[in-house]
Amino acid sequence: MKSSLFVVTVMLTAAAAMAATQVDMKDPRRALGREDDVRIDAQLLQDTLQSNGPISVTYQVENLSNAAIAIADRVSDIDFDPDGGMLTLTIGAEVLAAKTLPHLVVIAPGEKKTFRAGGTVHGVLNAHGPFAAVPHEVQIRVNVLRDVTAFRQAIAAQQHPNAVVAVTNDMFDHWIDSNDSIDLNALPVRWSSAPTRDGVTSADQPGPSTADRSAGGAW
């Protein structure tokens, strides 16, 4: 009896974990972006932001093209424009800024994958007083690698434990040529000037990204 109860508990826990990584398409904090045959849905997990506080999203990448695409799922950055009140969360790498290739996840043709990303709100220098410049909107930007041909061997090498793949000049050039930045619609947010108490994941060290596979072929 105890064994059966354990199995049921594990199944329920696994189901809850899977549900947590899905984008709620009915959530008012859902954003959408589409560039040709790549669609991205994202759900902002906070409606109130604060300085040094967390910002996190669940996002789904759907590849509607006939070729495989890839995303550097462990790379994220946060930028704040005080003039426009826009905070931008950028996911993936627009350029290869390091000497090692970032972790890449491939999305095959016809496939959907879901990830988590986030970081720490920073750059809000004047958050108090009548002339405070604080975020009023969040825009999510996702960088997608449209052509993975030049990175196939590198991606395969990354599957080995503790693998480190050096960036070559050809990789750098192909990345610039193949990268596509997809902007999702902006989402309104509130701002809190209350101090942050809990530690959060930084943009340079994002939390673990999870990918859920659905109907896609080999790439």
Locations of regions flagged by a protein language model:
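Hydrophobic h-region of N-terminal signal peptides that target proteins for export
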Residues: 10-20
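Low-complexity, acidic Ser/Thr/Pro/Gly-rich terminal tails and inter-domain linkers that flank the onset
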Residues: 21-51
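Beta-strand-rich interaction surfaces with strong enrichment in secreted/lumenal proteins
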Residues: 45-47, 101-107, 129
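Solvent-exposed, conformationally flexible loop/turn segments
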Residues: 51-52, 108-112, 118
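Short, solvent-exposed loop/turn segments enriched in Ser/Thr/Gly
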Residues: 52-58
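Asparagine-centered strand-capping/turn motif at beta-strand->loop junctions
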Residues: 59-66
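The feature marks short-to-medium sequence segments in extracytoplasmic or secretory-pathway proteins
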Residues: 66-112
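Terminal connector regions
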Residues: 121-199
